[in-house]
Design a protein with these regions (language model features):
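Expand to "…catalyze enediolate/carbanion chemistry for C-C bond making/breaking, isomerization
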Residues: 1-84
Length: 84
């Protein structure tokens, strides 16, 4: 599928996550990588889960193997890997 618009959203900012799903982006990427401070990464996963996002239009950008485990368990549409 081709995406015309992709919106990246910091995974630890609940208000921005909720707002993203009211917009018309074709794909939303919830970021657990560089936009989330290290001390907020676990909290970001909790926020994403509690926001009950539309997983059929959501990718997760992961930072570590633990994030990858979370993304796989939650069954998001796709996963973007961290930068090397």
């Amino acid at each position: 599928m081709k995406y015309r618009s992709v919106l990246f959203v910091p995974g630890h900012e609940e208000k921005k996550i909720k707002k993203a799903y009211t917009l018309s982006a074709d794909l939303i990427v919830l970021d657990l990588e560089s936009t989330v401070p290290d001390d907020q990464k676990e909290n970001a996963k909790k926020i994403i889960t509690e926001c009950n996002v539309n997983k059929n239009k959501t990718y997760i950008r992961v930072n570590s193997d633990l994030d990858l485990e979370f993304a796989t368990k939650e069954k998001f549409l796709g996963i973007l890997y961290f930068l090397l």
